[in-house]
Amino acid sequence: MEKKVTIINETGLHARPASMFVKKASEFKSSVELIHEGERVNAKSIMGIMKLGLAKGTEITIETKGEDEELALNSMIELVENGFGEKK
């Protein structure tokens, strides 16, 4: 399963939200990947996420595969759409 979402928090996917993303992705048995401009990274790897340099307004695709893929995808989308809990 996959869905495109846009990073909405002011500071983009810097260290704190990236660590939140990894922590959330690691809760699932399914694989979770981020895709940006053709580059695909494991969303359970903070280094992978950080190397993408995702700023506010960047569109990414979240892809999940596995037994809990729907729950994983919905949870990851919710995290991004809520701006990782940062004030807007």
Located regions from the model:
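C-terminal structural segments of small proteins and small subunits
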Residues: 55-88
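Absolute protein N-terminus
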Residues: 1-3
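Compact, glycine-rich, soluble single-domain proteins
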Residues: 6-47, 51-57
